[in-house]
Amino acid sequence: MLQVYLVRHGETQWNAERRIQGQSDSPLTEKGERQAMQVAQRAKALGITHIITSDLGRTQRTAEIIAQGCGCDVILDPRLRELDMGILERRHLDTLSEEEEGWRRQLVNGTPDGRIPQGESMQEVSERMHGALNACLDLPPGSRPLLVSHGMALGCLVSTILGLPAYAERRLRLRNCSISRVDYQQSPWLASGWVVETAGDVSHLDAPALDELQR
C-alpha cells in the first residue's frame, strides 16, 4: 500500500502578521525553521524516499530542511501551490473592506465558483492537487513520498478525498508543519483509491503553532 505524507510549510512572517499569502511569499520565521527541523527528524524515522514540494519559496525552504535530515533530493511541482488569492494577496486581514471580506467569505463558504478577483476557486485547487497526488502512483514500488504544500491547498485535497466539497477545508485544522497521511488502497472489501489515515498531526512539534488559535 502506497503511503503519502502531506506537510504544510513552516510558519512564515506573513502567517505571524495575519497577512494573506496565497501564491505570494514571505520567509519562514525562526519558529518556522525549527518546525521544519522537527519534521525532518520525523521524516527520517519514517523512511521517506522522495520529497516533492510546491515551488513557492516558503515550501521550498521547508522541503530543503526536511531533505537535509533524511538525505532526499527535492522535486518541484507547481501543482502543489497554494490557492491563488488574486488581488487580496499581501493584504492584512484587518484591512479588508466590506466588499473584499465578502469575496473572501464567498470563497471559504463554498459559493459556486466563488473566488477572489484574479484568483482561483477551491475546486480548481483541488483538481491540480489531486493531479500532484496521483503522480505518486508512478513512483517505484516501495516508495514513501512526502509532499510539502500549503494550508488551504492541503485542506482542499484532504476534504475531497473524504468525499466532501473542497470548501470543507475550513473544518480541518492543518497547522504549520503538521503531518497528514493518505494511503492508496486496492481492496475487494474496502473503498478503492485514496483514504485518509491521519490529518493535522503535530505530535512531533514542541510548539505546534498555538498562537494560531489565539489570533
Swiss-Prot record:
GO cellular component terms attached to this protein's record: cytoplasm
Keyword hit for Nucleotide-binding: no
Residues annotated as the enzyme's active site: 9 (tele-phosphohistidine intermediate), 82 (proton donor/acceptor)
Chain sites annotated for binding substrate: 8-15, 21-22, 58, 82-85, 104-105, 151-152
Gene3D superfamilies the UniProt entry points to: Phosphoglycerate mutase-like (3.40.50.1240)
Catalytic activity entry: (2R)-2-phosphoglycerate = (2R)-3-phosphoglycerate
Domain of life: Bacteria
GO terms under biological process: glycolytic process
Single Gene Ontology MF annotation: phosphatase activity
EC number(s) stated in the UniProt entry for this protein: 5.4.2.-
Pathway, per record: Carbohydrate degradation; glycolysis; pyruvate from D-glyceraldehyde 3-phosphate: step 3/5
Site residues, Transition state stabilizer: 150
Native organism: Cronobacter sakazakii (strain ATCC BAA-894) (Enterobacter sakazakii)
SUPFAM superfamilies assigned to the protein according to its UniProt record, in alphabetical order: Phosphoglycerate mutase-like
Pfam family, any one: His_Phos_1
Keywords for the protein's UniProt record, in alphabetical order: Glycolysis, Isomerase
InterPro entries registered for this protein in UniProt: His_Pase_superF_clade-1, His_PPase_superfam, PG/BPGM_mutase_AS, PGM_Phosphatase, Phosphoglycerate_mutase_GpmB
Class of this enzyme: isomerase
Protein name: Probable phosphoglycerate mutase GpmB
Family: Belongs to the phosphoglycerate mutase family. GpmB subfamily.
